[in-house]
Amino acid sequence: MSWTVGILRASQRAGTVRANFLCLGMAPSPCPPAATPLGGAWAVAPASKMATVKCELMKNFTSEEPVRNSKISIVGTGSVGMACAVSILLKGLSDELALVDVDEGRLKGETMDLQHGSLFVKMPNIVSSRDYVVTANSNLVIITAGARQEKGETRLNLVQRNVAIFKLMMSSIVQYSPRCKLIVVSNPVDILTYVAWKLSAFPQNRVIGSGCNLDTARFRFLIGQRLSIHSESCHGWILGEHGDSSVPVWSGVNIAGVPLKELNLDIGTDKDPEQWKNVHKDVVASAYEIIKMKGYTYWAIGLSVADLTESILKNLRRVHPVSTRIKGLYGINEEVFLSVPCILGESGITDLIKVKLAPEEEARLQKSAKTLWDIQKELKF
């Protein structure tokens, strides 16, 4: 944060009132004559030697109004929230980064840590507070906060507890940044994206779930490992739920336009002698494996969220598999959010790509929707 100390001294000359403001902040400001003592009856803060040093160091010509091109706020400074913050900072995607968390000690510590490294990421304005006013006028708000599942707790009960948390978050976010876009990262992400959409009353293009963007990255990485090809050159999608019922679209997997299904008709099925279906199994299992070994997954999701952020704030119109409302598509009639390929730009989700799925893939997507709806229909708002 930047801390500003203002010292006001009034003097009257020739019937006019002149006010001098001495600021110990980033914006330049006029300085009083060196012989004039600071303070007096009008002082609102104690005099500081730094005021003299600043005035000796600089000659001010005009006041400077802060110009902000973009502002990102992150709600939640746990491992995932901070991985998102660092990934965004390293990409230089905004002029201001605001952090919000209920844990004041952790929040202050994480903020100071980032501020001390701001020289290396060219980001001078990193602010934080427990109060959502710090998020005011955000272009993008990223939600990583939420309740964790307790031992033996049902998924429905976990989601219901998160609904209560999201009610508090969304009312403040909407109050201070009514035109922002939302990226929901908290799990279960598809259901909580639906919750955020319902509570915010934002149009669906401005409420985005991180969804299967990371699942797809894992999928492409593992395909690339099998073929000894960089994952960027492996084209394939994971759609549906971010979780166990996700759908690998084997019918569309290709390398340089060559569909792998033309080379192996049984790819991704039980009849496949190469057992490519294990690639998707590894995608689903990988998060559990990482959690078992190190406790959390956060770096990959942080990089994934920064990738989505870049597409939105730079209006790149890239296609990402993110969670959005898909009622009326693929035979799905429930009010659910699932990942499908979407074009992301400055308005959020500008378009949805109507991917042609094989019958068995569409059936799995419908099953994924039912899994989510069975929980959503029981939620109390």
Curated annotation (Swiss-Prot):
Q: What biological-process GO terms show up in the record? A: lactate metabolic process; pyruvate metabolic process
Could you tell me which pathway this protein works in?
Fermentation; pyruvate fermentation to lactate; (S)-lactate from pyruvate: step 1/1
Which keywords accompany this UniProt record?
NAD, Oxidoreductase
**Annotated binding of substrate, by residue:** 155, 187, 218, 297
Q: Where does NAD(+) bind?
A: 101-106, 148, 187
Gene Ontology CC, one term: mitochondrion
Q: What Pfam families does the record point to?
A: Ldh_1_C (PF02866), Ldh_1_N (PF00056)
Q: Which domain of life is it from?
A: Eukaryota
**EC number annotated for this UniProt entry:** 1.1.1.27
* Listed PROSITE patterns: L_LDH
Residues of the active site are 242
Catalytic activity line of the entry:
(S)-lactate + NAD(+) = pyruvate + NADH + H(+)
A GO molecular function term, named singly, is: L-lactate dehydrogenase activity
The record's similarity note reads: Belongs to the LDH/MDH superfamily. LDH family.
Q: Would you tell me the protein name for this molecule?
A: L-lactate dehydrogenase A-like 6B
Origin species: Bos taurus
